[in-house]
Regions:
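Intrinsic disorder/low-complexity detector
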Residues: 2-33, 41-43, 68-123, 156
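Short aromatic-glycine-enriched beta-strand elements
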Residues: 45-47, 126-127
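Mixed-charge, glycine-accented linear interaction segment located at domain edges/termini
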Residues: 54-61, 67-75, 122, 126-156
Length: 156
């Protein structure tokens, strides 16, 4: 192998490595979804979700609406990839409607959580959640565990 061929090989390997690193950074960039809770009346959350994939925040009302909108976002981004196909009785057409509130303020009136989703396995989510006001982070193994962590922060 000539010196020129060797240098081209090294250059190609560097390009491949940089591409892999860039994809991993972008992957991590989209894995965090910020959930801003503005109201929590009768244990029904109202607020907004933000993700770097979205141009603006998305409003939600209730736990089901929150989970469906995050799941729709995850499906659109394909990140993290689901390990199983979603099953439904009827397809849902929930649009990711932009929030009407000021998008510069990514804090909830009651609480703000950063959800880092690492996996979507066994028809659930796994990752970690950071409660900004309480300055604590906890791992969760299921959506139920995530919701219980959020509820415990909101009912303290």
């Amino acid at each position: 192998m000539t010196e020129r061929e060797y240098n081209q090989t090294i250059k190609m390997e560097c390009i491949i490595i940089m591409s892999i690193i860039k994809n991993q950074v972008l992957d991590n960039f989209f894995r965090i979804t910020v959930v801003c809770i503005d109201e929590y009346e009768k244990k029904i959350p109202h607020g907004r979700i933000y993700n770097n994939y979205l141009e603006k925040g998305v409003e939600f009302t209730g736990v089901i609406d929150l989970l469906k909108k995050i799941e729709l976002l995850l499906e659109e981004m394909n990140c993290p990839q689901s390990f199983s196909e979603r099953r439904v009785f009827r397809p849902s057409n929930i649009p990711l409607k932009a929030s009407q509130t000021d998008d510069d303020v990514k804090e909830g009136k009651l609480a703000t959580f950063s959800i880092r989703l690492l996996f979507r396995q066994n028809a659930s989510w796994q990752g970690s959640v950071t409660w900004h006001e309480g300055r604590t982070e906890e791992s969760f193994r299921s959506v139920l565990e995530l919701l219980l962590l959020i509820d415990s922060a909101l009912t303290e």
